[in-house]
Regions:
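Residue-level recognition of tetratricopeptide repeat
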Residues: 25, 59-60, 94, 129
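Residue-level detector of the short coil/turn that links helix A to helix B
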Residues: 31, 65-66, 100, 135
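TPR alpha-solenoid repeat register
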Residues: 15, 19, 53, 88, ...
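Position-specific recognition of the canonical hydrophobic site in helix A of tetratricopeptide repeat
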Residues: 21, 28, 62-63, 97, ...
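Short coil turns that delineate tetratricopeptide repeat
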Residues: 10, 14, 48, 83, ...
Length: 171
């Protein structure tokens, strides 16, 4: 369908933008990140400030632990455009955490919690990881317990990870 849109409406930038964005998402879901990133790059050539693509691209790079500087720059644009978007705050905070900046990441997660972050198992898990890294174990466990209650397979291996973190706290 996306290729058809690109054939039919090559000069309609809003349609081609959505087509490349959708193709990027589909390729990512199929596990072909190389093609996903190429599709996202094409979308960003049409609109370099398209926050949906910027966030997904940045998040997927962060999950792979790749190109964190690029991911940071893309994610920064998203929180500047939508400072109360819990998903974008999560991506930005997670990238900071992966860069070894847990203390800098914490306020972004606190803010995300005010704007829907408590509805997301992923965001609560990420926040708990940040708190754990900062040795705020009790609060980390509060968020992990909330995440465990809501987890419906969204975060694979969460229960085992929380058990391991509890063991690490006892040492």
């Amino acid at each position: 369908i996306c290729n058809k849109v690109l054939e039919i409406a090559p000069s309609d930038s809003s349609k081609t933008l959505r087509a490349w964005s959708t193709m990027g998402d589909i390729y990512h879901q199929l596990g072909d990140n190389k093609k996903a990133y190429k599709a996202y790059d094409k979308a960003l050539k049409i609109n370099p400030d398209y926050v949906y693509v910027l966030n997904n691209y940045a998040y997927y790079l962060s999950v792979e632990g790749r190109k964190l500087k690029k991911a940071y720059a893309m994610s920064k644009k998203t929180i500047e455009a939508e400072p109360d978007n819990a998903t974008y705050l999560d991506t930005f905070g997670w990238i900071l955490y992966l860069q070894g900046k847990a203390l800098e990441a914490k306020p972004f997660f606190k803010h995300a919690m005010l704007y829907g972050g408590k509805d997301s198992v992923v965001i609560m898990d990420h926040y708990a990881e940040v708190l754990f890294a900062l040795k705020e174990y009790d609060l980390a466990m509060v968020y992990w317990n909330l995440a465990l209650k809501k987890n419906d397979g969204e975060v694979e291996g969460l229960e085992e990870k929380v058990k391991q973190r509890r063991q690490a706290m006892k040492k």
